[in-house]
Amino acid sequence: MERGPNVRSLALISPTGLSKDAQERQPNEGLHKALSFPLWSQAFFDLLATRVSIRRFLNMSFQGEPDERLVDYSYKTAHQPGARFAPLAFVSGKLNSPDIRESIYEQLQHPVLVLYDEDPYTGFEALPGLMERHPNWQAKRIVPTRGLPHFDQPEQTFQALDAFWNEPPSDESES
């Protein structure tokens, strides 16, 4: 929003903050503090960052089996310096923005496309109301997918993005 003139449109892939209770979920500071405690935080991370655990989490986000190259990539990136802090923040909810719907989504003036389907980590119950209030919003369901349509159904995803980005700008979005 701060760079509004530099942005013509925005595509969101399986975004959080659109479930019916998204505004109620707050980061759990106590959980983050407990998980980050030096005595066991590395051991907890080591458990989360095994190939078996990574594959399990990716299986939840894929309609089919995740590509082994993605498992390998995820494993390698999880073992970079400082990487152990990201999963701890994710598990405790610190990566969520509980007010993103009001503070960001409701304020967007440019064309917005939401690509979604089933997602084990978030819901989309608030999406129809958001689209009703904001004609600059549109949604495309990419089926069958579970949170990562750009991996599960890349052709459908890219076609939807191309169609969206190639739409002529409306009079409303130009002003």
Regions found by a protein language model. Give the residues of each.
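Short aromatic-enriched loop/helix-cap "lid" or pocket-rim segments at secondary-structure transitions
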Residues: 21-26, 126-128, 152-154
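Active-site catalytic pocket residues across diverse enzymes, especially alpha/beta-hydrolases
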Residues: 3-4
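Flexible "cap/lid" loop of the alpha/beta hydrolase fold
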Residues: 7-41
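Conserved alpha/beta-hydrolase catalytic His-Asp/Glu region
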Residues: 21-25, 45-106
